Every structure is written in C-alpha cells, then in structure tokens.
Curated annotation (Swiss-Prot):
Coiled coil: none annotated. It is found in: Cytoplasm. It comes from the Bacteria. Belongs to the MurCDEF family. This is UDP-N-acetylmuramoylalanine--D-glutamate ligase. It comes from Burkholderia pseudomallei (strain K96243).
Length: 504
C-alpha cells in the first residue's frame, strides 16, 4: 500500500481536496500523520478533525524542518509546485534523505497494486491534456457505463481518487473500470501509475509557472503512459505525437491516433467529409487477419506491404449533441479509449449520441435574434480559446481577458483574424491581448466589466454569429472562479433576453 513501508509516518503538504483525501487514506491504514499548510486554519482542517483522524498540524510557511522527526513519506497536494520558493528547499531535503515524494495519484496506483494482490483487476483509463479533459473523461465514463460496466469517474474532475476508492471499498462495490481525469500537477508526482489505456488530448502553453517551463509541462503530461499502456494520441498535435512509440521498437506499446482528418492507419480514428456530411470514422485494414498481429510484427508487415485501408462510418458528427470540431475530436478520443479496453462498439455509439456536454465548456446558453450566446468560461488558456473559435467555425464576437498566467497570446491572432467580427477585452491582461491582436485587422474594445462587454458584443453581433465568452485567461483578477465568471455572463445575457421580451 505504501511501497516497501507498512505504516509510514507521512507528511501531508497542503490540505485541499486532494490533501484531505490523502490524509484520510493514510490514517485509515494506520499511518502517523503530520499535516502542514501555509494557512493557519485551512478550510478542511475541521473536516479532518471531525473524521476522528489523529494528526499533528503545522500552519504557516513551509520549511525543511517539517521532514524532521521520523518522516518516511511526503505527500504533495497538486496545487503546490515543488519549484515554489517556499517548497523547493523542503522537497530537496526530503530527496537528500531518500524520502519519497508522492502525490495522490501515486497513492492510488499503490492502492490498486495492493488490491490486485487479492484479485482485483479493473481496467483503468486515464485522460490528460491542456484542454478537453473533463468533457472526454465524462464522456468516456458514460460510454463504459453504456457498455454495461460498473464505472468510477474521479481525479481532477472530482471527487478525489482516494475518496472514491474508499467509498467503493466500504460499499463492497469496486468498479470494473476507473476513468480518471489527470492534470499535469497530479501526474508530476506519479511514479508507478500504469493505466490500461490513456490519452493526451493536446499540449499547449499552460501552468508554465508551476512547472518551470513548457518542456517540463509536456513531460509531466507524458507520465500518463505506463510501459504497456495503449496510447491514444491526437495526430493533429505535434507535441502529443512526440509520445508515439518508435516504429522499430520490438516491445513498443500499442498506439492509435485520432484527428480531424481522414485516418490512414489501421485502427485509427478521424473525420470523413463526404457530400457535405462529416462522419466519425475508423480506419480498417481490408486485408487484416481476424486475429491481429502483435504491434511490432504488424508494423513490420505494414512497412513491407502497406495496408489497404477502408473507412468505416461510425456516425455523422452532427449527431453529437456537443458543439464544435474540437468536441468531435474529444468524442473520438473517448470512443478510442473505450475500444482500447475491449468494449463493444454498438453501445458506445449510442452513448456518443446521448452525451450533452459539461457546463461552461462551449455551452450555448441562449439564441436571441439568431445570435448564439456561448459560455466557454472554462477556456482559461490560449489553446482552449483557439479550439472554441475553430470548433464553432462561425463568425463571432469574442470576449477575452483576465489573468493570463504568463502565456504567449500570439497563437490567438490567426483564429481571431479568421472568425472574429470584433473582440471585447476585459481584465488585467487586456493590454497584452490587445498587443497580440493588434495586427489582425479585427476591431478591439476595452471594457471595465464583463457585463459591459456582453452588451457591446450583443450590439455588434449579426444573425448567425456567436457572442463567445472564451477568456483564454484565469478568472481570479475579477471573479471568485471560472463558474462565477460564467454566472455573470449568463446574468448579462438574461438581462438582454428580458429586454427582447423573452427568457432563457
């Protein structure tokens, strides 16, 4: 359960949702606990006390002295960067003493290994990427359920993995399939995690301050793959395709790709555009044997004799209830993951048609006088906003801005020039956005509030357009969180609807 340690003394750093779950899990298994948080009274302190857990609490600045006194294992909450000025010396001190540093995902992986010794062998699906994780995770969970499996969905999507596992153990209802949404923070401190199938949906700039740079951020995403994990890769993303196994490697894991073009290799997924209809398709080798060769042997055969590929139509893309080409890609990824663990196609396709999407993720909240009002408040980075604009593929008045987290806004310029009638700028980093978009030829307007930006956008939008809130930025400079930002947007749209004599 804890590597080669039976009941170690554990230092839990940070008492957020994940830290609380780790503390409860460790206490459940007889560990001695020291819990530290930079806040003197973190919100979850009362919850941990109420759970009857015996622990020592240390509030205030982190210091290397926290690993003194017999600490054998350090548990790091995902919100805490090991590179942070107050934390780096502590992490260094732990490693100098040979004390492992784990995150919740590593505790979860160790727990599954321990349960596996008693015969528990679930399938594990993992989803990461800069954008699209929650949609793909929720959809993959639904697909597995529709295939008749008992499914647990957890991770970055909430609830915490260890809380979900505890609940399942106590209910004597361990799932057949785990579907996990994983952030780069969670993956950074994983060491033995090895899911059956995993995807990296995309990799664009985000959380660079936490990881110390783009290379480290991308490397953290790559930790989602174990040595035998089926790799489901976005072939439209060059950074993702760096994780494709080498073709010549005899022991290379199986890999399949998805993308918005026609797939060219057996088992890959994509889109076929024919007679004005876009189809979700799977590439099938017409000459393939009923029993497929091992991956390395198959690659050698394909090199000698290129396969005769046919495209099997799965369903029209328009039959998906989630909007945008980026969501077609997410649907293909979820389907590929479910197929990778051996689930039958028919119930999965029914699930794809059923899924309605997640709130605040390219969610059409109203159509007024022919104008769509689209809430993409969860679009907190440049890649998300690029995906929203390209995915909607319609003329838009974009509302963007907030806390840019040190991102480069230049990649927004091309899709803004292609799709935007105008851009309404809000928030702290509006000047940086203005500079990045200055040469697009698209009108730019600054607004002190989101409400003012929505009104101005509504006045400019034409029938067939979208008023798109996709900020490309975090929200904390103006709002409590992205959901609060979405609520303000919705309220402003409701006011406009009332003035037009209707309601949402």
């Amino acid at each position: 359960m804890f590597g080669d340690r039976q009941r170690p003394m554990v230092l839990v750093l940070g008492l957020g949702e994940s830290g609380l779950a780790i503390a409860r899990w460790c206490a459940r298994h007889g560990c001695r606990l020291r819990v530290a948080d930079t806040r003197e009274t973190p919100p979850n302190l009362a919850a941990l006390t109420a759970a009857g857990v015996d622990f020592e609490f240390v509030g205030g600045a982190f210091s290397p002295a926290l690993v003194d006194g017999g600490i054998e294992l350090v548990a790091l909450s995902p919100g805490l960067s090991p590179l942070a000025e107050d934390l780096a010396p502590l992490v260094a001190a732990a490693r100098e003493r040979g004390i492992p540093v784990w995150g919740e995902l590593e505790f979860f992986a160790q727990a599954l290994a321990a349960l596996g010794a008693n015969g528990y062998a679930p399938k594990v699906i993992a989803i990461t990427g800069t954008n699209g994780k929650t949609t793909t995770t929720s959809l993959a969970g639904l697909l597995c359920e529709r295939a008749g499996k008992k499914v647990a969905v957890a991770g970055n999507i909430s609830p915490a993995m260890l809380d979900k596992l505890t609940e399942a153990i106590d209910a004597a209802a361990l799932p057949d399939v785990w579907v996990l949404e994983l952030s780069s923070f969670q993956l950074d401190t994983a060491h033995t995690f090895a899911p059956d199938a995993a995807t990296i949906l995309n990799i664009t700039q985000d959380h660079l301050d936490w990881h110390g740079g783009f290379a480290a951020y991308a490397a953290a995403k790559g930790r989602v793959f174990g040595p035998r994990t089926v790799r489901v890769l976005n072939r439209d993303d060059a950074e993702v395709m760096r994780f494709a196994p080498p073709a010549a490697a005899a022991d290379a894991p199986r890999a399949v790709t998805f993308g918005l073009n026609e797939p060219a290799a057996d088992g890959d997924y994509g889109l076929l555009r024919e007679n004005g209809i876009a189809w979700l398709v799977e590439a099938i080798d017409r000459d393939g044997a009923d029993a497929p060769a091992a991956p390395s042997r198959r690659r050698k055969q394909e090199a000698a004799n290129p396969p005769d590929i046919a495209l099997k139509r799965l369903m029209p893309a328009d039959a998906l209830r989630i909007r945008g080409l980026h969501n077609a890609a997410n649907a293909l990824a979820a389907y590929a993951l479910a197929r990778a663990i051996g689930l039958p196609a028919a119930p999965l396709l029914h699930g794809l048609r059923e899924y309605r999407g997640e709130p605040h993720r390219v969610e059409v909240i109203a159509t007024l006088d022919g104008v769509d009002y689209v809430d993409d408040s969860k679009g907190t980075n440049v890649g998300a906003t690029v995906a929203a604009l390209d995915g909607l593929a319609q003329r838009a008045v974009l509302i963007a801005g907030g806390d840019g987290k040190g991102q480069d806004f230049e990649p927004l310029a091309a899709p803004v020039a292609r799709w935007c009638r105008a851009v309404m700028l809000i928030g702290r980093d509006a000047p940086a956005l203005r500079e990045a978009l200055a040469d697009t030829g698209v009108p730019l307007a600054d607004h002190a509030t989101l409400e003012a930006a929505v009104r101005a956008a509504s006045a400019l939008a034409q029938p067939g357009d979208a008023v798109l809130l996709s900020p490309a930025c975090a929200s904390l400079d103006m709002f409590r969180n992205y959901a609060h930002r979405a609520d303000v947007f919705r309220s402003a749209v409701e006011d406009i609807a009332l003035e037009k004599g209707t309601t949402l």
